[in-house]
Amino acid sequence: VEGVSQSKIRYNIEIKSQIDGDQIFHPKFNEFVDLVVNDIRSKNIESRVTIQSFDFRVLKYLKNQYPSFKISMLVNENYNFSNIFDDLGFYPDIYSPNFKNLTYEIVKKVQEKKIQVIPWTVNSYDDIAKILELGVDGIISDYPDRVKYLLDEKI
């Protein structure tokens, strides 16, 4: 990708891990993070990488051991927003919830903390339009062309 791109590409890398998968389906979470970070650093792309995960152990370890990395906190639709950052223990760079329960109030509360809001995975035109109206900072979608189309329509 780097060799054929005309501009510097940003990477959003998800570390998929969970407690009951440690050393069965993937390395122990801290070893997993170390492997990913070493690979990123070997390619000299650290400044263009965001690491995301649902596994708060990964995010906490990343924050403590590699504080220069941009961190995205993934949460599913069943997560209680009221104490979410207390559970993590710090404010991530990005709050990335399932879009289904996202509200204008939540977006504004998070952005007041200087955290970007980038929901996932928003695919239908109707859902993309609704989420854009909330004032999010970005959208994760399987159809970026749809997001671009709706953004271009607003201009």
Residue ranges, per PLM feature:
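Short loop-to-alpha-helix "cap/lid" segments that border enzyme active sites
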Residues: 2-155
